[in-house]
């Protein structure tokens, strides 16, 4: 068992079932809508102390983050690195669905992606469903390109 007591659960992100070993409940609490307990994982990820240290060093400020948050970020980074092998990538953008089709607005931070998506929601009302407003997963398949929400 790890320092906080290992917890292994299966989640589905971008239609990929993945086993996730965690030290605590932060990841599990934030990903509860993605649980896929009966699915067989394609792979298993776990964050080490070294991974947590790396995430802390990557922060853009001098704040010290809780280990539970750093673990969340480290685990998600590991998933995204492996997801490429399954035709899934993480994109910085805002994705919405209208009339059965997804639309993504992608640009540098502060450009107005979320504002633009809000204008669509205001204009088209109930016809619009937000898929993800920051970092959607995009999956490339033979029958098309699919967008998925993320925790």
Task: Describe the residue ranges of each PLM region.
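Hydrophobic positions on the alpha1 helix immediately C-terminal to the Walker A/P-loop
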Residues: 116
């Amino acid at each position: 068992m790890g320092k906080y007591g290992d917890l292994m659960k299966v989640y589905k992100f971008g239609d990929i079932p993945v086993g996730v070993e965690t030290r605590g409940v932060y990841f599990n609490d934030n990903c509860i809508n993605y649980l896929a307990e009966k699915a067989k994982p394609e792979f298993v990820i776990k964050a080490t102390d070294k991974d947590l240290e790396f995430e802390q060093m990557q922060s853009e400020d001098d704040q010290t983050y809780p280990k539970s948050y750093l673990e969340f970020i480290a685990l998600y980074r590991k998933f995204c690195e492996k997801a490429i092998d399954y035709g899934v990538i993480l994109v910085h953008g805002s994705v919405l669905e209208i009339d059965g089709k997804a639309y993504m607005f992608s640009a540098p931070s502060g450009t107005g992606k979320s504002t633009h998506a809000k204008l669509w929601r205001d204009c088209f009302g109930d016809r619009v469903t937000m898929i993800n407003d920051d970092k959607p997963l995009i999956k490339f398949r033979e029958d098309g390109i699919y967008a998925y929400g993320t925790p």
